[in-house]
A protein has these predicted regions:
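Conserved small/polar residues in nucleotide/adenosyl-binding loops
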Residues: 200-205
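Glycine-rich adenosine-cofactor-binding loop
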Residues: 13, 121-140
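NAD(P)-binding Rossmann-fold cofactor-contacting core
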Residues: 147-164
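An anion/phosphate-binding loop that grips the pyrophosphate of nucleotide cofactors and donors
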Residues: 188
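Short glycine-/small-residue-rich Rossmann-like dinucleotide-binding loops
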Residues: 68, 195-196
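Phosphate/diphosphate ligand-binding glycine-rich loop within oxidoreductases
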Residues: 2-116
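Conserved S-adenosyl-L-methionine
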Residues: 141-146
Length: 205
């Protein structure tokens, strides 16, 4: 039962209705006997700064961060974990230090690793936002044959591909318009979708 001593954590994004995080986290808190509550907050981009500052003032302990805030939220934090700084995106905030972290990449790599190896695979990444940045950097560390980053805004795809190359993790990364995805997928071993299309489908159901 929520009371005055309950610690609040949550998710910020726009939208958040699709998220499975609240039931998953709250079930875990209950099972572990932890006095925490996980709450989703639908925050429009123009309200991001006030939401972050307000959350700290309200003694909220931490946030997970989802689309579309993973990059822009960094400017409102005091510290960044080295990996989050390298990636250029944040998906977790600890308000105790106003510090941002990124766990998207390692989470994706571990999930794929349960099914297949990434080494020597031809990989297509759809999207070039915060999640795509994290995943692309981690993929590059696993020695894939190639990484193709496809995005609606081709300049964002180009920028991400160049950042991955500049990290010296791999040279086998390129970019293109997401309009050409059919041609890339036909030759791909692994397809990773980081675009909002999946969320739109979930909201429709």
């Amino acid at each position: 039962m929520i009371n005055g001593s309950t610690k609040i954590v949550g998710l910020i994004g726009h939208p958040v209705e699709h998220s499975f995080s609240p039931p998953m986290h709250n079930a875990a808190f209950e099972e572990l006997g932890l006095d925490y509550a996980y709450v989703p907050f639908n925050v429009c981009p123009e309200n991001l700064k006030s939401a972050i500052l307000g959350a700290k003032s309200l003694n909220i302990k931490g946030f997970n961060v989802t689309i579309p805030h993973k990059i822009n939220v960094m400017k409102y934090l005091d510290k960044l974990d080295p990996i989050a700084k390298l990636i250029g995106a944040v998906n977790t905030i600890d308000f105790k230090e106003m510090k941002g972290y990124n766990t998207d990449g390692i989470g994706c790599i571990k999930a794929i690793g349960e099914v297949t190896s990434i080494k020597d695979k031809n990989i297509v990444v759809a999207g070039a936002g915060g999640a795509s940045r994290a995943i692309s950097f981690y993929l590059a560390r696993e020695n894939p044959q190639s990484i193709h980053i496809l995005n609606r805004d081709i300049n964002k795809a180009k920028s991400l591909a160049e950042d991955v190359k500049n990290s010296k993790l791999t040279d086998n990364v390129d970019f293109d318009s997401i309009d050409k995805i059919v041609g890339y997928v036909s030759d791909a071993d692994i397809l990773i979708d980081t675009t909002p299309v999946s969320y739109t489908h979930l909201r429709a159901h």
